[in-house]
């Protein structure tokens, strides 16, 4: 999927103090992410939870292994937040947390949460955040197959293949 925003120059803004970005080996918590996105001015908090599924194109998956270039990935997260605030100025909170390491089927790999006064902007901003993260962040995954083999998946592979990953 292509970005919903026109191409914009790189913004060197510091994220708002209320925002939260992380690359971590620790398990991710829906409740914690929701709380980080919550604000008394919000009418909506939209959370997107990405998880390890049990197959890719019908081929059984047993686990995924994520690696990231953390400093650059965090800069991409900051840029996503800046883009969101430019397109949807009412957004109060942007939360993006991604796991690294080996994850089993059913485990959460990424959580994105957007806090905003109105649901339509929150949904649009959350969709933009996850789509842009998957396309731009230097985070790689290795699919471990049931037959014992494994395959690395490159950044933006979902968009290049035209599939919904």
From Swiss-Prot:
Its EC number is 2.8.1.12. Pathway: Cofactor biosynthesis; molybdopterin biosynthesis. It is an enzyme of class 2 (transferase). Keywords: Molybdenum cofactor biosynthesis, Transferase. Substrate binds at residues 51-53, 118-119, 134, 141-143. GO terms for molecular function: molybdopterin synthase activity. CDD domains: MoaE. One of its GO terms (biological process) is Mo-molybdopterin cofactor biosynthetic process. The keyword Transferase applies. The keyword Transferase applies. It catalyses: 2 [molybdopterin-synthase sulfur-carrier protein]-C-terminal-Gly-aminoethanethioate + cyclic pyranopterin phosphate + H2O = molybdopterin + 2 [molybdopterin-synthase sulfur-carrier protein]-C-terminal Gly-Gly + 2 H(+). InterPro entries: MoaE_sf (IPR036563), Mopterin_biosynth_MoaE (IPR003448). It comes from the Bacteria. Heterotetramer of 2 MoaD subunits and 2 MoaE subunits. Also stable as homodimer. The enzyme changes between these two forms during catalysis. Belongs to the MoaE family. Converts molybdopterin precursor Z into molybdopterin. This requires the incorporation of two sulfur atoms into precursor Z to generate a dithiolene group. The sulfur is provided by MoaD. This is Molybdopterin synthase catalytic subunit. It comes from Nostoc sp. (strain PCC 7120 / SAG 25.82 / UTEX 2576).
